[in-house]
Amino acid sequence: MTNIRKTHPLAKIVNDSFIDLPAPSNISAWWNFGSLLGVCLILQIATGLFLAMHYTSDTATAFSSVTHICRDVNYGWIIRYMHANGASMFFICLFMHVGRGLYYGSYVFMETWNIGIILLFATMATAFMGYVLPWGQMSFWGATVITNLLSAIPYIGTDLVEWIWGGFSVDKATLTRFFAFHFILPFIIAALAMVHLLFLHETGSNNPSGITSDSDKIPFHPYYTIKDILGVLLLLSVLMSLVLFSPDLLGDPDNYTPANPLSTPPHIKPEWYFLFAYAILRSIPNKLGGVLALVFSILILALIPHLHTSKQRGMMFRPLSQCLFWLLTADLLTLTWIGGQPVEHPFIIIGQIASILYFAILLILMPTISIIENNLLKW
């Protein structure tokens, strides 16, 4: 008799995706981040749901409702901090996942890569709106500054900003709609993640060597299920250490002050995972130019498959490209540091150099070095 998991319509989908899926035998720990992102998403939806049961999206009570969650709700403090720090873990996994894709040439799977870029944008939008909800000083001013960037769009900019605000400033209408979008977007992200997997399973996974692994496949279960469980345990260990020992380490102290439209904080900055993009935005003196650079800093990922000039897929056997990749990593860390610094000398010039270098590496240096490597190998 055939096993039910291979015949039942629903079980068959699960079986073909997580049990009998043929996987390359040599994929490293860098391939763990996809499943970790899935775990992060489930964790965020679960904790977010419980937070939404007690949160009120009204300017008069939003801040105190978050305080109420932390003080009066059973285990409310741990739910709140798991959600806040879970977002940080989410972005760490996202950056690692995208970095893996860049390093090993996973962007050759165009459909999977493009859905991934949409997922990245959707996650960033969700995180931004979530940061506004506690209605602290940084929530309010962050929302004001970032939404105001849209006013740089010619002709329709001002009207667009007021339409998003639902008035002439960030107020009750803005908070309510941000809560609505923050609630619905994770479910859209979950649906997109399924499409992401659907496209991935059309081609099968890439592997560190970058060559086809059709001749050497192993079943996903038990080999990679057990490997993923190890990754999940490590992720949860780091997350819970953060939540239980220093929950406010990655937050901003200004957000413990209720939002006040009459008092601007000395340094307005977003959460740490947006600082690299914020630094790129600030490094251009022109408003519209800054906004375009900000958008393009992520959208540039869509160009990567078209700029692939190497005859090898991954960077495993390309030391010159590896040097550039790690230079890019260092550059992004520099941008993250600059994004959190005040706008003054020498931070301005460091930010501008790092921003130029970021685009230069991806658009000019990497394709050029790849051609040089091809010639060195007489290809």
From Swiss-Prot:
GO molecular function: metal ion binding; ubiquinol-cytochrome-c reductase activity
Binding sites annotated in the UniProt record for heme b b566: H97, H196
Subunit structure: The cytochrome bc1 complex contains 11 subunits: 3 respiratory subunits (MT-CYB, CYC1 and UQCRFS1), 2 core proteins (UQCRC1 and UQCRC2) and 6 low-molecular weight proteins (UQCRH/QCR6, UQCRB/QCR7, UQCRQ/QCR8, UQCR10/QCR9, UQCR11/QCR10 and a cleavage product of UQCRFS1). This cytochrome bc1 complex then forms a dimer.
Any GO CC annotation of this UniProt entry: respiratory chain complex III
Official protein name in the record: Cytochrome b
Gene: MT-CYB
Superkingdom of origin: Eukaryota
Cofactor(s) demanded: heme b
GO BP annotations listed: mitochondrial electron transport, ubiquinol to cytochrome c
UniProt cofactor note: Binds 2 heme b groups non-covalently.
Function: Component of the ubiquinol-cytochrome c reductase complex (complex III or cytochrome b-c1 complex) that is part of the mitochondrial respiratory chain. The b-c1 complex mediates electron transfer from ubiquinol to cytochrome c. Contributes to the generation of a proton gradient across the mitochondrial membrane that is then used for ATP synthesis.
UniProt source species: Vulpes vulpes (Red fox)
